[in-house]
A protein has these predicted regions:
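Individual transmembrane alpha-helix segments
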Residues: 72-107
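N-terminal signal-anchor transmembrane alpha helix
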Residues: 13-55
């Protein structure tokens, strides 16, 4: 059975050609890398704000960082390391970099989500994926207008975390299939 003649609502999760599994692996691997990247940016911003070293030049900041930077702890990530390029950014440039990085990460996850739909033979559901991204994106606009600790900020971060995971495409692939199975298992259908 190919993806084209698969029953409506049923994804093709072939073990002979497990492209869907490769895409899921890419999503999980990229998710780990992007999470570590965002933690590095946020840690550098927090340390920079606490130490007020934004007026120092790149060499002074790098020397200070190597000698005195605190260890960053976020859930199970523990690190002092940072990217050297951060030392040459002003605070405003680093915030712009953070937003650009978040946008790029969302774009990559959207592409991976579409690839998962295609690899499971349900590419016709891409519009549903777009609806999920737009719906989850509305609260994310709050990130630009709120600050950590506010309820809107927490909701927006949760929505961002949802989009930066395999969950949107996995939902679009599996939920219709589960609904069809439930409907067909009812007596009298």
């Amino acid at each position: 059975m190919t993806a084209l003649d698969a029953p409506r609502g049923r994804p093709e999760l072939s073990w002979r050609k497990p492209w869907w599994l490769v895409v899921l692996g890419l999503m999980l691997g990229f998710g780990l890398v992007q999470e570590q990247s965002k933690i590095k940016v946020n840690h550098y911003l927090q340390v920079g704000d606490a130490e007020q070293f934004w007026d120092q030049n790149a060499q002074e900041r790098e020397s200070w960082w190597q000698a005195s930077a605190p260890v960053g702890r976020h859930n199970f990530y523990v690190s002092r390391a940072t990217w050297t390029v951060f030392h040459s950014f002003s605070r405003g440039q680093l915030v712009a970099f953070k937003w650009g990085l978040s946008g790029l990460i969302l774009l990559v996850f959207f592409i991976l989500d579409v690839l998962l739909l295609r690899s499971t033979g349900v590419a016709e559901r891409v519009p549903w994926l777009v609806v999920i991204y737009v719906t989850a994106g509305i609260p994310m606009l709050g990130l630009g207008f709120s600050s950590p600790g506010e309820a809107w900020y927490a909701l927006a971060r949760d929505m961002l975390g949802f989009l930066q995971s395999p969950l949107p495409s996995v939902m679009v692939v599996l939920v219709p299939w589960f609904l069809d199975r439930m409907a067909s298992s009812r007596p009298g259908t």
